Amino acid sequence: MSGTTHHHATFPAVEAAAFTRRHLDDLAAGLLGTVRVPGFFGRPALDTMLTSLHRVPVVSFDLDRMHHPMARFGTALNDYRTPELALDADRYWHDADTARRQWAGIGMTPDPLELALDALGRAWGVRPAPATIGGRPAFVGMLREVNDGTFIHYDDINREYRGGLFDQKIVAQLAFNAWLAAPREGGTTTVWRHRWEPADENRRHGYGFQPTAVADDPYVTVAPAAGDALLFNANNYHVVHPGAPGQRRIALACFLGVTAGGELVVWS
Protein backbone atom coordinates (compact mmCIF):
# COMPACT_ATOMS: atom_id res chain seq x y z
CA MET A 1 0.00 0.00 0.00
CA SER A 2 1.65 3.24 -1.09
CA GLY A 3 1.71 6.36 1.05
CA THR A 4 3.87 9.24 2.17
CA THR A 5 4.50 10.86 5.54
CA HIS A 6 6.65 13.94 6.01
CA HIS A 7 8.19 14.92 9.30
CA HIS A 8 8.65 18.66 8.88
CA ALA A 9 7.11 21.48 6.85
CA THR A 10 10.56 22.59 5.65
CA PHE A 11 11.11 19.23 3.93
CA PRO A 12 7.80 18.55 2.16
CA ALA A 13 6.71 15.45 0.30
CA VAL A 14 4.75 16.13 -2.89
CA GLU A 15 2.38 13.79 -4.70
CA ALA A 16 1.52 14.74 -8.28
CA ALA A 17 -0.06 13.37 -11.43
CA ALA A 18 3.19 13.97 -13.35
CA PHE A 19 6.68 15.33 -12.76
CA THR A 20 7.17 18.99 -13.70
CA ARG A 21 10.11 21.32 -14.28
CA ARG A 22 9.26 23.02 -10.99
CA HIS A 23 9.59 19.69 -9.18
CA LEU A 24 13.02 19.07 -10.67
CA ASP A 25 14.20 22.60 -9.93
CA ASP A 26 12.94 22.50 -6.34
CA LEU A 27 14.50 19.10 -5.67
CA ALA A 28 17.81 20.31 -7.08
CA ALA A 29 17.63 23.41 -4.87
CA GLY A 30 16.82 21.39 -1.75
CA LEU A 31 13.33 22.85 -1.35
CA LEU A 32 11.48 19.51 -1.50
CA GLY A 33 12.00 16.16 0.17
CA THR A 34 10.43 13.87 -2.41
CA VAL A 35 8.07 13.91 -5.38
CA ARG A 36 5.99 10.78 -5.97
CA VAL A 37 3.83 10.07 -9.02
CA PRO A 38 1.31 7.28 -8.36
CA GLY A 39 0.54 5.16 -11.39
CA PHE A 40 3.56 6.43 -13.32
CA PHE A 41 3.37 3.15 -15.21
CA GLY A 42 -0.28 2.47 -16.02
CA ARG A 43 -1.66 -0.91 -14.99
CA PRO A 44 -1.95 -2.36 -18.52
CA ALA A 45 1.64 -1.31 -19.35
CA LEU A 46 2.91 -2.63 -16.02
CA ASP A 47 1.20 -5.99 -16.50
CA THR A 48 2.80 -6.33 -19.93
CA MET A 49 6.25 -5.42 -18.58
CA LEU A 50 5.97 -8.02 -15.85
CA THR A 51 5.41 -10.81 -18.38
CA SER A 52 8.95 -10.13 -19.68
CA LEU A 53 10.65 -9.80 -16.31
CA HIS A 54 11.65 -13.46 -16.12
CA ARG A 55 13.82 -12.98 -19.23
CA VAL A 56 15.95 -10.27 -17.62
CA PRO A 57 19.41 -11.63 -16.64
CA VAL A 58 20.58 -10.35 -13.27
CA VAL A 59 23.80 -10.34 -11.28
CA SER A 60 24.48 -9.57 -7.64
CA PHE A 61 25.94 -6.31 -6.41
CA ASP A 62 29.40 -6.60 -4.89
CA LEU A 63 28.59 -8.00 -1.43
CA ASP A 64 31.94 -6.87 -0.03
CA ARG A 65 30.84 -3.31 -0.76
CA MET A 66 27.07 -3.44 -0.27
CA HIS A 67 26.76 -5.94 2.64
CA HIS A 68 23.08 -6.58 1.79
CA PRO A 69 22.15 -9.03 -0.99
CA MET A 70 20.85 -7.10 -4.01
CA ALA A 71 20.35 -8.10 -7.62
CA ARG A 72 20.64 -5.88 -10.66
CA PHE A 73 20.36 -5.88 -14.42
CA GLY A 74 22.73 -3.44 -16.08
CA THR A 75 25.73 -1.59 -14.75
CA ALA A 76 25.92 0.44 -11.55
CA LEU A 77 28.86 2.83 -11.77
CA ASN A 78 29.86 2.31 -8.14
CA ASP A 79 30.60 -1.35 -8.85
CA TYR A 80 33.31 -0.23 -11.30
CA ARG A 81 35.15 2.25 -9.08
CA THR A 82 38.78 1.53 -8.27
CA PRO A 83 40.39 2.23 -4.87
CA GLU A 84 41.89 5.33 -6.51
CA LEU A 85 38.34 6.66 -7.22
CA ALA A 86 38.75 6.08 -10.95
CA LEU A 87 36.66 4.03 -13.39
CA ASP A 88 37.66 0.47 -14.25
CA ALA A 89 36.94 1.43 -17.84
CA ASP A 90 37.59 -1.84 -19.69
CA ARG A 91 35.29 -3.81 -17.43
CA TYR A 92 32.62 -1.10 -17.32
CA TRP A 93 32.32 -0.59 -21.07
CA HIS A 94 32.31 -4.32 -21.73
CA ASP A 95 29.47 -4.86 -19.26
CA ALA A 96 27.55 -1.75 -20.36
CA ASP A 97 27.64 -2.80 -24.02
CA THR A 98 26.59 -6.33 -23.05
CA ALA A 99 23.65 -5.01 -21.02
CA ARG A 100 22.47 -2.84 -23.92
CA ARG A 101 22.48 -5.84 -26.25
CA GLN A 102 20.68 -7.98 -23.69
CA TRP A 103 18.01 -5.32 -23.12
CA ALA A 104 17.36 -5.00 -26.85
CA GLY A 105 16.99 -8.78 -27.04
CA ILE A 106 14.47 -8.96 -24.19
CA GLY A 107 12.02 -6.80 -26.11
CA MET A 108 10.09 -5.57 -23.07
CA THR A 109 7.08 -3.69 -24.45
CA PRO A 110 6.38 -1.03 -23.51
CA ASP A 111 9.95 -0.23 -22.55
CA PRO A 112 9.95 1.20 -18.99
CA LEU A 113 13.14 3.17 -19.64
CA GLU A 114 11.69 4.84 -22.72
CA LEU A 115 8.49 5.69 -20.85
CA ALA A 116 10.53 7.18 -18.01
CA LEU A 117 12.80 9.26 -20.25
CA ASP A 118 9.81 10.54 -22.20
CA ALA A 119 8.07 11.62 -18.99
CA LEU A 120 11.21 13.28 -17.62
CA GLY A 121 11.68 15.01 -20.96
CA ARG A 122 8.17 16.43 -20.78
CA ALA A 123 8.98 17.73 -17.30
CA TRP A 124 12.33 19.30 -18.22
CA GLY A 125 11.36 20.48 -21.69
CA VAL A 126 14.04 18.39 -23.43
CA ARG A 127 14.45 14.62 -23.22
CA PRO A 128 17.50 13.90 -21.04
CA ALA A 129 20.52 12.38 -22.75
CA PRO A 130 23.01 9.99 -21.15
CA ALA A 131 25.96 11.57 -19.38
CA THR A 132 29.17 10.93 -21.29
CA ILE A 133 32.60 9.68 -20.25
CA GLY A 134 35.27 10.62 -22.76
CA GLY A 135 32.52 11.13 -25.31
CA ARG A 136 30.89 7.72 -24.72
CA PRO A 137 27.35 7.56 -23.30
CA ALA A 138 27.04 6.03 -19.83
CA PHE A 139 24.68 3.12 -19.34
CA VAL A 140 21.13 4.08 -18.35
CA GLY A 141 18.33 1.77 -17.26
CA MET A 142 19.36 -0.45 -14.38
CA LEU A 143 16.72 -2.73 -12.89
CA ARG A 144 17.44 -3.26 -9.21
CA GLU A 145 15.94 -5.69 -6.71
CA VAL A 146 16.42 -4.58 -3.10
CA ASN A 147 14.44 -6.79 -0.73
CA ASP A 148 16.58 -6.68 2.42
CA GLY A 149 17.19 -2.94 2.67
CA THR A 150 20.31 -0.79 2.57
CA PHE A 151 22.46 1.24 4.94
CA ILE A 152 21.81 4.95 5.34
CA HIS A 153 23.87 6.59 2.59
CA TYR A 154 24.01 9.33 -0.01
CA ASP A 155 25.02 9.40 -3.68
CA ASP A 156 27.27 12.06 -5.17
CA ILE A 157 29.14 11.39 -8.41
CA ASN A 158 31.49 14.29 -7.67
CA ARG A 159 32.68 12.63 -4.44
CA GLU A 160 32.56 9.03 -5.63
CA TYR A 161 34.86 9.64 -8.60
CA ARG A 162 37.81 11.97 -8.47
CA GLY A 163 37.04 14.84 -10.82
CA GLY A 164 33.39 13.83 -11.18
CA LEU A 165 33.93 11.26 -14.00
CA PHE A 166 31.59 12.79 -16.61
CA ASP A 167 32.37 15.20 -19.41
CA GLN A 168 29.53 17.31 -18.01
CA LYS A 169 29.88 19.16 -14.69
CA ILE A 170 27.10 17.92 -12.40
CA VAL A 171 25.80 20.58 -10.01
CA ALA A 172 22.77 18.66 -8.68
CA GLN A 173 22.06 14.93 -8.61
CA LEU A 174 18.57 13.45 -8.31
CA ALA A 175 17.61 9.81 -7.80
CA PHE A 176 14.78 8.30 -9.86
CA ASN A 177 13.00 5.05 -9.05
CA ALA A 178 9.95 3.54 -10.73
CA TRP A 179 8.70 0.31 -9.16
CA LEU A 180 7.74 -2.69 -11.24
CA ALA A 181 7.09 -4.77 -8.12
CA ALA A 182 6.69 -3.76 -4.49
CA PRO A 183 6.09 -5.55 -1.18
CA ARG A 184 2.72 -5.22 0.52
CA GLU A 185 4.53 -4.29 3.73
CA GLY A 186 7.89 -2.62 4.31
CA GLY A 187 10.34 -1.69 1.58
CA THR A 188 9.88 1.99 2.37
CA THR A 189 12.36 4.71 1.42
CA THR A 190 13.31 7.37 3.96
CA VAL A 191 15.06 10.57 2.88
CA TRP A 192 16.53 13.00 5.42
CA ARG A 193 17.25 16.69 5.03
CA HIS A 194 20.89 16.00 5.74
CA ARG A 195 23.98 16.32 3.54
CA TRP A 196 27.42 14.96 4.26
CA GLU A 197 29.48 16.86 6.82
CA PRO A 198 32.93 15.99 8.21
CA ALA A 199 31.60 14.92 11.62
CA ASP A 200 29.66 12.14 9.89
CA GLU A 201 32.89 10.25 9.30
CA ASN A 202 32.79 9.37 13.01
CA ARG A 203 29.45 7.65 12.41
CA ARG A 204 30.47 5.40 9.52
CA HIS A 205 28.75 2.04 9.09
CA GLY A 206 30.05 0.02 6.14
CA TYR A 207 29.49 2.05 2.98
CA GLY A 208 27.00 4.22 4.86
CA PHE A 209 26.30 5.79 8.22
CA GLN A 210 24.82 5.00 11.60
CA PRO A 211 21.28 6.22 12.40
CA THR A 212 22.73 8.72 14.88
CA ALA A 213 24.00 10.75 11.91
CA VAL A 214 20.43 11.75 11.04
CA ALA A 215 18.66 11.35 14.38
CA ASP A 216 17.62 15.01 14.65
CA ASP A 217 16.96 15.76 10.98
CA PRO A 218 13.61 16.22 9.18
CA TYR A 219 12.71 13.28 6.99
CA VAL A 220 10.24 11.87 4.49
CA THR A 221 9.20 8.22 4.32
CA VAL A 222 7.61 6.85 1.15
CA ALA A 223 6.01 3.41 0.82
CA PRO A 224 6.42 1.88 -2.65
CA ALA A 225 3.66 0.60 -4.88
CA ALA A 226 4.01 -1.16 -8.22
CA GLY A 227 3.77 1.43 -10.99
CA ASP A 228 4.64 4.44 -8.81
CA ALA A 229 7.71 6.62 -9.41
CA LEU A 230 9.79 8.65 -6.97
CA LEU A 231 12.30 11.49 -7.30
CA PHE A 232 14.52 12.92 -4.55
CA ASN A 233 17.86 14.66 -4.23
CA ALA A 234 20.47 11.89 -4.08
CA ASN A 235 22.86 14.07 -2.03
CA ASN A 236 20.44 13.81 0.90
CA TYR A 237 20.99 10.84 3.17
CA HIS A 238 18.51 8.06 2.41
CA VAL A 239 17.80 4.42 3.15
CA VAL A 240 15.65 1.57 1.89
CA HIS A 241 14.03 -0.42 4.69
CA PRO A 242 13.60 -4.20 4.39
CA GLY A 243 10.41 -5.49 2.84
CA ALA A 244 8.22 -8.28 4.15
CA PRO A 245 9.85 -11.70 3.78
CA GLY A 246 9.27 -13.37 0.44
CA GLN A 247 8.03 -10.20 -1.28
CA ARG A 248 9.96 -8.57 -4.12
CA ARG A 249 10.89 -4.91 -4.55
CA ILE A 250 12.06 -4.26 -8.13
CA ALA A 251 12.62 -0.80 -9.58
CA LEU A 252 13.93 0.90 -12.68
CA ALA A 253 16.66 3.11 -11.23
CA CYS A 254 18.81 5.91 -12.58
CA PHE A 255 20.27 9.26 -11.61
CA LEU A 256 19.47 12.63 -13.14
CA GLY A 257 22.16 15.27 -13.23
CA VAL A 258 21.59 18.97 -13.68
CA THR A 259 24.71 20.29 -15.40
CA ALA A 260 26.52 23.60 -15.07
CA GLY A 261 25.22 24.38 -18.56
CA GLY A 262 21.60 23.87 -17.52
CA GLU A 263 21.13 20.50 -19.23
CA LEU A 264 19.62 17.33 -17.77
CA VAL A 265 21.64 14.12 -18.16
CA VAL A 266 21.02 10.57 -16.93
CA TRP A 267 23.05 7.54 -15.87
CA SER A 268 22.75 4.40 -13.76
Swiss-Prot record:
InterPro entries: WelO5-like. GO terms for molecular function: L-gamma-glutamyl-L-propargylglycine hydroxylase activity. Keywords: Amino-acid biosynthesis, Antibiotic biosynthesis, Dioxygenase, Iron, Oxidoreductase, Plasmid. Its EC number is 1.14.11.-. The keyword Iron applies. It comes from the Bacteria. Pathway: Amino-acid metabolism; Antibiotic biosynthesis. It is an enzyme of class 1 (oxidoreductase). Disruption phenotype: Cells lacking this gene still produce L-propargylglycine but not L-beta-ethynylserine, that are terminal alkyne-containing amino acids produced by wild-type S.cattleya. Its cofactor is Fe(2+). One of its GO terms (biological process) is L-beta-ethynylserine biosynthetic process. It catalyses: L-gamma-glutamyl-L-propargylglycine + 2-oxoglutarate + O2 = L-gamma-glutamyl-(3R)-L-beta-ethynylserine + succinate + CO2. Involved in the biosynthesis of terminal alkyne-containing amino acids such as L-beta-ethynylserine, that are produced as antibiotics by S.cattleya. Catalyzes the hydroxylation of the dipeptide L-gamma-glutamyl-L-propargylglycine, leading to L-gamma-glutamyl-L-beta-ethynylserine. Cannot use L-propargylglycine as substrate. This is L-gamma-glutamyl-L-propargylglycine hydroxylase.
